[in-house]
């Protein structure tokens, strides 16, 4: 069965960093579609200047992978409802959809992590946007996305090592709480 992995969390939550280990080594997923990484490939010194083009290329690549029935992963903050159609389309095509949400214990920690990323040459996100996405992404995870995926996991990535807080298969199944 083909699988779609959605790697989610606020800006600075460690999604990309975790993806480079978790996806290939643990989940055996070799296709990772990430608009930020596409933008860096298009314009390494000014990725924000090609964000729209990177988004188009991301959508095109997702379509190609779905058409081929290949397992793949996407990265998102879940701050909008834009992944609902992808989830439904993938499930209609026989994909199993798993959502891994990397949570941080405060928007201030997210802001600090983004500052560290920028200091190391990574892309910036303004603090007001981080705060907005922190709130909306977490709300959308619980209200919109958890009910429609085949499996979800909530991991606290506030410190090292990350801690799995809870997970469940399908809505209505027993939720396993590992760490409160």
Question: Residues of each region from the PLM?
Answer:
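Conserved substrate/cofactor phosphate-moiety recognition/catalytic segment
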Residues: 19-70
């Amino acid at each position: 069965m083909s699988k779609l992995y959605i790697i989610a969390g606020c800006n600075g939550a460690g999604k990309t960093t975790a993806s480079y280990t978790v996806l290939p080594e643990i989940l055996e997923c070799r296709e990772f579609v990430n608009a930020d990484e596409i933008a860096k490939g298009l314009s390494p010194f000014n990725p924000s200047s090609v964000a729209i083009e990177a988004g188009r290329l991301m959508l095109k690549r997702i379509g190609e992978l779905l058409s081929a029935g290949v397992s793949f992963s996407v990265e998102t903050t879940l701050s909008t409802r834009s992944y609902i159609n992808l989830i439904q389309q993938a499930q209609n095509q026989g994909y199993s959809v798993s959502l891994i949400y990397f949570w941080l214990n405060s928007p201030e920690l997210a802001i600090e992590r983004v500052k560290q990323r920028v200091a190391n040459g990574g892309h910036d996100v303004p603090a007001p946007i981080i705060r907005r996405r922190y709130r909306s992404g977490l709300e959308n995870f619980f209200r919109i996305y958890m009910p429609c995926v085949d499996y979800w996991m909530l991991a606290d990535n506030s410190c090292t090592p990350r801690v799995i807080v809870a997970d469940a298969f399908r809505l209505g199944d027993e939720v396993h709480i590992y760490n409160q």
